[in-house]
């Protein structure tokens, strides 16, 4: 397995993977999310590749206060092999190298499948309520 930075030629394969991993929501246009990321620090957008195929992704960010991880997903046939752990570990190292003191991951409360993994990796529940506001309306995906 190789972990590397996203490249333009990964575009369609990544969107297909996100569909397979059930990461897409009607209010988020994945093509626009990728385009925006490519225009704003693509070096934190990582893919895991096995035999030339993209089997995992994580899209990271850093705002000077904390890091974040989005679109963490691994192809169902490749789960349980440590790929998500490796992606997060690489992202964390990149964030630490930038002086980032902490990372945040938003997970639906009922997603028990991944909550255990995050806890094993040292992530803790934060007693906060996450609020959001759409600033630019995308076309429904």
UniProtKB/Swiss-Prot annotation:
Pfam families, A to Z: Acetyltransf_1 (PF00583)
User: What is its EC class?
Assistant: transferase
Q: Which domain of life is it from?
A: Bacteria
Arranged from A to Z, the UniProt key words for this protein are: Acyltransferase, Transferase
Family under the similarity heading: Belongs to the acetyltransferase family. YpeA subfamily.
From the UniProt record, which GO molecular function terms apply?
acyltransferase activity, transferring groups other than amino-acyl groups
> Per its UniProt record, what InterPro entries does this chain match?
Acetyltransferase_YpeA, Acyl_CoA_acyltransferase, Bact_Acetyltransf, GNAT_dom
Q: What is this protein called?
A: Acetyltransferase YpeA
Task: Show where the N-acetyltransferase domain sits.
Answer: 1-141
Enzyme Commission number, as recorded: 2.3.1.-
Keyword Acyltransferase part of the UniProt annotation = yes
Q: Does the keyword Acyltransferase apply?
A: yes
């Amino acid at each position: 397995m190789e972990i590397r930075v996203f490249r333009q030629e990964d575009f369609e394969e990544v969107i297909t993977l996100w569909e397979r991993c059930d990461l897409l929501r009607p209010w988020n246009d994945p093509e626009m999310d990728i385009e925006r990321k490519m225009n704003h620090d693509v070096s934190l957008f990582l893919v895991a590749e096995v035999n030339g195929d993209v089997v995992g992704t994580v899209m990271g960010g850093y705002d000077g206060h904390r890091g974040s991880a989005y679109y963490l997903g691994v192809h169902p046939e490749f789960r349980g092999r440590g790929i998500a752990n490796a992606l997060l570990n690489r992202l964390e190292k990149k964030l630490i190298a930038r002086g980032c003191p902490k990372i945040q991951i938003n997970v639906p409360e009922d997603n028990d499948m991944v909550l255990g993994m995050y806890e094993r990796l040292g992530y803790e529940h934060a007693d906060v309520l996450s609020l959001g506001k759409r600033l630019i309306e995308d076309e429904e995906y």
